[in-house]
Amino acid sequence: VEKMSKVLNFTRKDFEREQNLGKGLILVDFSANWCGPCKMLEKVLNNLSGRVDYRIARINVDEESELASELKIKSLPSMMILKDGEIIERLTGFMEDDEIEKIVKKVRKRESNTNE
């Protein structure tokens, strides 16, 4: 059975659409095929995507190098958390799923406090 939530492959167009129209939380992973830690993170995110209630997307920085430099992605892997199209958190380096979940929880808490 195909899990509903799998990691989405994003292009620049998808990312811009997300910034303009995005609702809710999305974790965007910037990675490259030649990057070892990215490959490890890919597995973690694939695993995570099946059991979290937010979307996860991946952007290949070799295919979207212009976007990556505009967003000042300096090292790989890098992740961003967007809420309603706004970048609210940037993460760098490989992380295990529990670390990622902890950060998402923290970000959600922080965001819900700022909106009241």
Indicate residue ranges for each PLM-predicted region.
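Short, Lys/Arg-enriched N-terminal segments with co-localized hydrophobic residues
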Residues: 1-3
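A short beta-strand-turn-helix
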Residues: 7-26
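Thiol-based oxidoreductase modules, predominantly thioredoxin-like and allied folds used
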Residues: 8-10, 30, 42-66, 73
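Short loop/turn elements that flank and shape the SAM/SAH-binding pocket of Class I
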Residues: 13-17, 64-67, 98
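Short pre-active-site segment immediately N-terminal to redox-active cysteine/selenocysteine motifs
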Residues: 24, 30-34, 75
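The canonical Cys-X-X-Cys-His
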Residues: 35-38, 79
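Structural micro-motif
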Residues: 71-80
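Non-catalytic, surface beta->alpha helical segment in thiol-disulfide oxidoreductase systems
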Residues: 81-115
